[in-house]
């Protein structure tokens, strides 16, 4: 097994297998990234396009499904476009159209006690006090956080942003945060020796065996003493 090999041979295998491990891991996690991405698109009424992400880097574009954001029924010259939605209008837009879908009531729980020989406790979520950013509300996966972090940061500190900071700027930050995270996970699985070792350690329990010189054993397992 990998663990039984010499340190020198282990390092040779790590160098040889790093790209294969990266590809395998990112193929497994890629669908989770895409699920978070599609859910975010639906939430923000945007669509990512012409995007790519890999070990070398990432790039993306996005567009709005509906732009202008607000249409004036009387005079179209008063329509408000995403790149014009700034300041208090932007905060109100986020507060009314985004935050209700990514927040929930703050969680409260009693310390618990024995009742009828069973340990029980009471819990509830507040209908008044909201909790922001405590979990991953889009899909339940950690990648939600990287999409929503810029929005949550803006919501908490919007007064500190420039007056011309727009919805377009904010959504671009969200996509950039997300694709940067995705790219960095590629780097992690290719560059982090401890992560590669762990994968190789786990693979030995999936019948991945080696000769002493590091070559992969491909014979029948019945022949292994």
Locate predicted features.
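Alpha-helical propensity feature that highlights long, continuous alpha-helices across diverse contexts
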Residues: 1-225
